[in-house]
Amino acid sequence: MFLLPRFVLVSCIIGSLGFDNPPTNVVSHLNGDWFLFGDSRSDCNHVVTTNPRNYSYMDLNPALCGSGKISSKAGNSIFRSFHFTDFYNYTGEGQQIIFYEGVNFTPYHAFKCTTSGSNDIWMQNKGLFYTQVYKNMAVYRSLTFVNVPYVYNGSAQSTALCKSGSLVLNNPAYIAREANFGDYYYKVEADFYLSGCDEYIVPLCIFNGKFLSNTKYYDDSQYYFNKDTGVIYGLNSTETITTGFDFNCHYLVLPSGNYLAISNELLLTVPTKAICLNKRKDFTPVQVVDSRWNNARQSDNMTAVACQPPYCYFRNSTTNYVGVYDINHGDAGFTSILSGLLYDSPCFSQQGVFRYDNVSSVWPLYPYGRCPTAADINTPDVPICVYDPLPIILLGILLSVAVIIIVVLLLYFMVDNGTRLHDA
């Protein structure tokens, strides 16, 4: 009678010790409220136009093609669409956001604004851009692009100063020098307007170096002035180098309002596109899958640099990307990572996704959701789960009590039997 509860308790402990719930290297979701942004490796529409139709082109499981939870474009990326004429209007909304894109702007494309420019600066721009995107999509549900209207009162038009190969920069726009100016030592302005979104990601860029034109060197200077609040955002060139520099961009998160773009020297730049952020949500870390080429092409790690906890979880394969459709499409390792989108999972962490929320031999780092051996503790802005020792303490107390009872009963029966034998 006394042994039954202890037997059940010990059986439960043994069962839990034999249960394995390691973190898995996948991206997943808590429920159906999720969205994926991608490129050709998750572009179902692109596969439909191939002849013959071949879903091995993708790393995404074809079962998700009709989900309505994917915004992907072959040959493109959010960064590429943000800055260049090669544009796709990425649009999506969800509580849990996943990104699997970025490979379509890498050192392989070798983009730089001028022949003496630097692709390294553009890789830096890419990292800064995705840092803002990932941070903000941890607190916003909706992402899309919007055009930014501007008014310039001069007669000069925007110019394609910054271009390389098939890529032509059009965000921000360069306003050409007025015909009556003999050099670039002049001040010029343009009005632009942000409306319809909660917040916007816009570029503020300068040539950070000595820009040579007709034997004269110029220092770039660009400002945005919020005419409603009086806040000024600005960049001035600080480098003295004359070669090997390029277009340095900062990515500002701005509210709706009326703005003035100001140039004190060199060409005026004005934003023409913005990332539109809408519908604030409870903090939910985004998930990013490494987007890279087969080793035959040069890739970068800028999405990994941008994706940092607690706002972002980064997933990567441990092997070279080797596709089955071609070397850059249909890799088994990345297909495995995306397979987690086929099911719900209760817990996310820096190490991976936990399939069960009961116990695990691995301590979840930066956990989110219903995590193994954990309880939800809600802080004002960042819901996290932390270890709860109460169940283990209770088990220890019960085991201690059980041992004491067994010892007492054994002593009692030993003494009682000894007394009976002595009396006999």
UniProtKB/Swiss-Prot annotation:
The organism's place on the tree of life at top rank: Viruses
Region feature Receptor binding, mapped onto this chain: 128-266
InterPro entries found in the cross-reference section: Capsid_hemagglutn (IPR008980), HEMA (IPR042545), Hemagglutn-estrase_core (IPR007142), Hemagglutn-estrase_hemagglutn (IPR003860)
Active site residues per record: S40, D326, H329
Protein name: Hemagglutinin-esterase
Side Virion surface, residues: 17-392
Compartments, as annotated in UniProt: Virion membrane; Host cell membrane
Biological role: Structural protein that makes short spikes at the surface of the virus. Contains receptor binding and receptor-destroying activities. Mediates de-O-acetylation of N-acetyl-4-O-acetylneuraminic acid, which is probably the receptor determinant recognized by the virus on the surface of erythrocytes and susceptible cells. This receptor-destroying activity is important for virus release as it probably helps preventing self-aggregation and ensures the efficient spread of the progeny virus from cell to cell.
EC number: 3.1.1.53
Region (Esterase domain 1): 7-127
Reactions the enzyme catalyzes: N-acetyl-9-O-acetylneuraminate + H2O = N-acetylneuraminate + acetate + H(+); N-acetyl-4-O-acetylneuraminate + H2O = N-acetylneuraminate + acetate + H(+)
Pfam families noted in UniProt: Hema_esterase, Hema_HEFG
Keywords of this entry: Disulfide bond, Glycoprotein, Hemagglutinin, Host cell membrane, Host membrane, Hydrolase, Membrane, Signal, Transmembrane, Transmembrane helix, Viral envelope protein, Virion
